[in-house]
Amino acid sequence: ILGLTAIGEDPANVAGYHLLAALSDYDATTQPGVTSAAYVLLALDCGNYEIPKTEAGKTQATREMYVDFMLGKQLSDGGWAIGAEEADPDVTAMVLQALAPYQSNTAVKNAVSLGVQRLSKLQNDDGGYTSWGYTSSESCSQVVLTLCALGISMDDSRFVKNGHSVLDKLLTYQLSDGSFCHEDSYDAYATMQALCALSAAVRQQAGKRAFFTMTDAAKQTHAPQSGVAAHTAQVEALPAFSDISGHAN
């Protein structure tokens, strides 16, 4: 949903599938944990989508329910985690990104304030973060996304340790070919997260909307394809090689 919205496509009609429909089932979407609820809310809010009506017998989800679920999972130290009693920087960052647009609610505003304080305390002396005993670029990326979502400068003193910002630390993970590493070698997931974080930072510097607010994405104007049959026809129309044994890719 996030990817489709970013390129101007409609997630309510993808080859006949309504991808938003799955987000209407509160029990199913919250069962995996707090990060699942966070990304459901990010997906709904990225295009300001309405939550579809869920199937009979299932619990109808609302934005308020997702917000309350995340608030209820906040730890006593101010952060969030999965299966732990102490805050994890990645999980805390993801939840704060989702809660950022709801700070007109006093309870949310207070929770966000505590979460930001905890993220600041979790930062290492070199500007980075440690999650589950490992330092990685992904943790830095999530915090950069969070600061941008909350309108906090990369140079905010709360997130600069010994002259090193979290953005400074993130850039140390970039390899010579432009990709990013998880710890010391190329990692696709790390690269994807780093690009999202850097895009968010660029958007913030340019005064644009937050990264996950995609209502300014240019909408595609082509007529939607209906169902699998239309796509099958497209595949069948592709040129075929009678003998591919010697064909170079």
Q: Language-model segments: which ranges?
A:
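An alpha-helical repeat/solenoid feature that recognizes helix-turn-helix modules
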Residues: 1-13, 29-63, 68, 75-113, ...
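Alpha-helical scaffold repeats of the Armadillo/HEAT/TPR superfamily
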Residues: 18-21, 58-61, 65-66, 111-115, ...
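A conserved helix-loop-strand patch within extracytoplasmic ligand-binding domains
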Residues: 20-30
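Terminal, non-catalytic domain-edge segments
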Residues: 169, 183-241
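Gram-positive cell-envelope targeting signals
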Residues: 194, 248-249
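Solvent-exposed, low-complexity, repeat-rich "mucin-like" stalks and linkers
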Residues: 242-248
